[in-house]
């Protein structure tokens, strides 16, 4: 947030996908702000149990598969397979356009594929290169979790989905949630050549940049 000149006071809403630390560790920084935090019940309960300070936030609880509105947006959360309490992706609609956020899923379900294929803008996980993961010093249990059906999408998994996309519908695709240790931009590009007409619309969100670090206001 800091590289963009933003603070918690500037944020109106936070949409949680799940409770893992890399997604919500800075949430308590918003205690002094006005942001509403949207999450399903299991995710909210898990976060508040791990970080009691977050109980002071303004929580808005939804059910997966339900549609709700916020500030001119139509928001549809959908279930995703991940090793968390109740992980979701999001579809945000406004002005006839759809933005779909889809990270942290071990496989592309029929539901996730449907949302992705109807997205004008898609944020899609391309988390790891299998070869780099296998050669990494990570323990076997972690490698198995990442590769599992409730882990993360590999580069090949992401590309397989991209090959099903309609270039007349997709306007922009961001490949994100890229592992710093077990992936690289060249490894992703190596596979992208086979995606067809949609290739010029794809942007890789590199993790090797200070701008991707989470907001931290310096308070304990």
Placement of each model-derived feature along the sequence:
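Active-site metal-binding motif and surrounding structural segment of the metallo-beta-lactamase
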Residues: 1-39
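Core dinuclear metal-dependent hydrolase active-site scaffold
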Residues: 2-9, 25, 62-121, 213-220
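Active-site neighborhood of phospho(di)ester-bond hydrolases with catalytic His/Asp-centered motifs
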Residues: 12-22, 38-41, 100-103, 123-125, ...
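Active-site environment of divalent metal-dependent phosphoester hydrolases
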Residues: 20-24, 45-46, 84-85, 108-110, ...
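Metal-dependent catalytic neighborhoods of phosphoester/phosphodiester hydrolases
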Residues: 25-34, 48-50, 183-190
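Active-site neighborhood of divalent metal-dependent phosphoester bond hydrolases
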Residues: 43-61
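Cap/insert and terminal regions of metallo-dependent hydrolase folds
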Residues: 110-206
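Short, basic/aromatic-enriched C-terminal tail that caps enzymatic domains
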Residues: 198-220
């Amino acid at each position: 947030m800091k590289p963009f000149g933003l603070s918690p006071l500037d944020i109106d809403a936070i949409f949680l996908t799940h409770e893992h630390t890399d997604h919500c560790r800075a949430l308590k920084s918003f205690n002094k702000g006005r942001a509403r935090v949207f999450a399903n019940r299991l995710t909210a309960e898990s976060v508040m149990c791990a970080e009691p300070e977050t109980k002071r936030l303004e929580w808005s609880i939804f059910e997966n598969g339900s549609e709700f509105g916020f500030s001119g947006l139509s928001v549809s959360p959908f279930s995703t397979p991940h090793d968390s309490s109740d992980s979701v992706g999001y579809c945000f609609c406004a002005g006839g356009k759809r933005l779909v956020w889809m990270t942290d899923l071990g496989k592309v379900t029929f539901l996730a594929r449907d949302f992705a294929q109807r997205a004008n803008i898609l944020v899609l996980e391309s988390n790891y290169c299998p070869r780099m993961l296998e050669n990494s010093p990570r323990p076997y249990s972690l490698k198995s979790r990442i590769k599992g059906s409730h882990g993360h999408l590999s580069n090949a998994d992401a590309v397989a989905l991209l090959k099903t996309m309609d270039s007349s519908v997709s306007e922009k695709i961001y490949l994100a949630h890229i592992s710093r240790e077990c992936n690289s931009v060249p490894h992703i590009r190596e596979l992208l050549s086979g995606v067809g007409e949609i290739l010029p619309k794809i942007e890789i969100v590199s993790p090797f940049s200070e701008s991707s670090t989470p907001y931290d206001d310096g308070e304990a």
